[in-house]
Every structure is written in C-alpha cells, then in structure tokens.
Amino acid sequence: NVLIDDVIGTALFTLLPCDPADLASCDFTHAAFAGEDLRVLIGQITTAGDLTGQLQVQVFVEGDADQEFRGIIPFTPYAPELLVDGCIDPAACNYDGEATADDGSCVYCGAECAGGSDYSMTVELHVEDVVAGQTTYRFYQNMINPDDFLSSVYGNEDAPFVFETTTGFYNSQFGGSVASAINPAFLSFFPDLAADSWVTIGIESQNVGDEVAISTCL
C-alpha cells in the first residue's frame, strides 16, 4: 500500500510544454493535456484484492497556470455493478448519501457546480491474468476541457495520497514506481512487466521524442 501524509509530502509532476504567457505556443498533443477523450492516465495497479484511496491533483484549467483547480479526488472499490450515480460532495445542497460515483450534478447554494466534483477519477479494468490470479486496473483523471493540463498529482499532511488494496500490489523487478521507468523493449522478454504497478501523468512507458519523463519532488 502507498500512504503519503507527512508535512513535506510528495509530488509527481510534469512541466507545461509552452510559454505560460503564450498559450498558442502549447503542444496540445502532450500527454498531460486532456485531449478529445477528456481524461489523462494517472496510474496502473495490479492486484488480486479490492482498491480504495484518494489523491490530490493540480489542473491548469484550459492550460492557464493562473487558473488552476486543486482538489482531492477519491475512488471507491472497483465494482461497476455496485456504483450509484449522484452527488457525493457533503457540501452540496443535493448531497446524496447513497451515491458512490459522482455524476457532476452537485448544486451549491442554488448555483450549478462549476468545479470541484466535475473533476473526478475513473478506475477501469485494463487486463486480467498477466500475472495469474491478478487484475490490472488503470486510473484516469477526468477533465472538463480538452486543453485542461494535469500539472501534478500529490499528497501531504493536509491531503494524503492513498492507494490501498486488500492484498497488496504487483511490482515487476524490471519496472519502476513511475511509468517512464517502463522499457517497452523488455516486454517480450519479461511479459509480467506489462502488469507492473506505477503512477504517471499521461504516458504509459519510457518517454519518447518530445515527451518529458515523469518527475517526482520529495
């Protein structure tokens, strides 16, 4: 399990690929931009157990570093048949205590929710039995705009970064804690590398071309 709840904290980050004063110069194909599918890959976990946790994200809304969203994004055990759509923010007027998956319907003091719960996380089943008896899940940060930029994923004393399973994670000896440590050339020799558990911002293996390796700050 992973728990980051100290005063200093830990951040996973990538740099904005353009001049902040000239957004027209941005490379919007960069993996940290939401793109047309409005989401950014943030992790892969392989386990035989159930998943729970939360993390905090920093998003530059429409690529503008002066207009950022920061929020704690929780996720519940992966069990699609048990998900109940609704407003899961207790601060909202229409909070639904029975809901387990936010559907963007939260209303605050008569006004439509314009932030917060609109940024959410999706956990998807990626592949099964690369490692016998275990399931590989992928985590995606859901965005609002195609040019939203996921700048960092982090945890600290005020907003812990938590990934927990009931049985532990699978880690390949040839992998790493971040996706940029995964060398695709090794996959044919070590198939279990495809099931390695890691965190990321957008990329799923070693950075290539103009891609930037994922950085961490402790």
Model-derived segments and their meaning:
Residues 1-84, 111-218:
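Non-catalytic macromolecular-recognition regions in eukaryotic signaling proteins
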Residues 81-112:
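Extracellular calcium-associated, cysteine-rich motifs in secreted modular proteins
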